[in-house]
Amino acid sequence: MKYNLNQLFKNHRIKGLSTNSKTVKEDEVFFAIKGQNVDGNDFINDALNNGAVLVITENKNNTAIDKVIYVEDVHKALYEAIEIFYPKKPKNLISVTGTNGKSSVVSYIAQAYSLLKKKAAFIGTIGLEIFGSNNIINDVPSLTTFDYLSFRKVAHNLAEDSIEYLAFEASSHGLEQGRLGKTKVNIVSFTSFSQDHLDYHHTKENYLLAKLKLFTDHLLPSGIAILNSDIEEIEFVKDYLHNNNVKFITVGKKGDLQITKITCSLTGQNIDFIFNNIIYNLHTLIIGSFQASNLLIAALTLYYTGFKFDEIIEALAKVKPIKGRMERIDGTNIFVDYSHTPDSLEKALIELKNIKLHGSKLSVIFGCGGDRDKTKRALMGQIAAKLADNVIITDDNPRFEDPKLIRAEIIRGIGTATYTEIASRAEAIKYGINNLKQDDILLIAGKGHETYQIIGDKKLPFDDSEVVRKYLFEISYTRN
């Protein structure tokens, strides 16, 4: 029997849709979808007990249960239902992918629109942030890329709130798993590419091709792709997009928007660049020369949505850094950064090494996550030993792995260089601070914005920035 979902939902006065039996609300429809690890059909009774008014499934074995309706394709039914319940989206959709830099770029884009008096929002690793509205959207997932239903719920609510611009991150996992569904966007960008997530994608080529799905599957025919020209695989990416009839522009030292000079300090940077044969200068409080391309990707995003470059530069000069991205703690020489890949750790260390005063030392504290890409651990140890004067190895979300073994894999990459191993991350931070001398710099890498430490299946409260602030206060109080 075929069902008219629109009529069916009207008959039952449906209030919403859900694919999670734990969070489904009263009078919502539960779609029993088989995922990679969990089958929603195993939780139909849970969903009904939690208030689901209907269950949609493609598993005929469950249709004997009252309120359970069989369809041939549950994903197709879900997409149809989404168009009924959450049809609206902000007029301008912008998506960003890349190994590093996604969170920074979507934040810069939304901030810049807001500074130009437009209502904007961004979605990503650090969550959902809305500019120009006091409304709060609940039930936001803690994923870099939301599942399609969650994305459309949020996008619909933002559109209802008159948000005009939505920038969101697209992770390789999210793209590979089809979390964006049939979403089409106006502008996409590629910030960077380096080794990560090989535990999931197995090869770097698979990882790259997963990211390129954003450009071939989700960009409107009238849209444009913005690429970082300094990506090592840029020629392959350009050929791939050209063969798929994707229009693109590049940003970087050899880009169509050409960065000609970057002057960095502990308080910010000056970026000189040429675009359309005009020389521009951008002064920003955001630290890190690797952020120059991120800022200018944001600049081109605004340009291709109708803004003039002079007003864009004026807005970007006022953009603030986001939590945990080269975050300088209260004017000290202590930085907290999310760098958790070999490439991002190397860039952060090189940046701080270049701007530290002659004769001062650079220290780094970091660990590696458990149950994640193991191949990067020794490499990150090698990078830290090469670039930092003092290396402190600690724990970072060990999950179900033995943290001592994770640290040992990192230390293997350090080789004969000296290092300090401190299991407790809080104690490692205190040790790093205690050993700082005048003008020394300390980088605390890996967790960035995170406010937890994952041990086993428990998320324990932990925030690098707050640990630093608390300890600095304790030191100050003791001295006074």
Swiss-Prot record:
One of its GO terms (cellular component) is cytoplasm. Keywords: ATP-binding, Cell cycle, Cell division, Cell shape, Cell wall biogenesis/degradation, Cytoplasm, Ligase, Magnesium, Nucleotide-binding, Peptidoglycan synthesis. The keyword rRNA-binding does not apply. One of its GO terms (molecular function) is UDP-N-acetylmuramoylalanyl-D-glutamate-2,6-diaminopimelate ligase activity. It comes from the Bacteria. It is found in: Cytoplasm. A motif (Meso-diaminopimelate recognition motif) lies at residues 396-399. ATP binds at G98, T99, N100, G101, K102, S103, S104. Gene3D superfamilies: Mur ligase, C-terminal domain (3.90.190.20), Mur-like, catalytic domain (3.40.1190.10), MurE/MurF, N-terminal domain (3.40.1390.10). Its cofactor is Mg(2+). Its EC number is 6.3.2.13. This is UDP-N-acetylmuramoyl-L-alanyl-D-glutamate--2,6-diaminopimelate ligase.
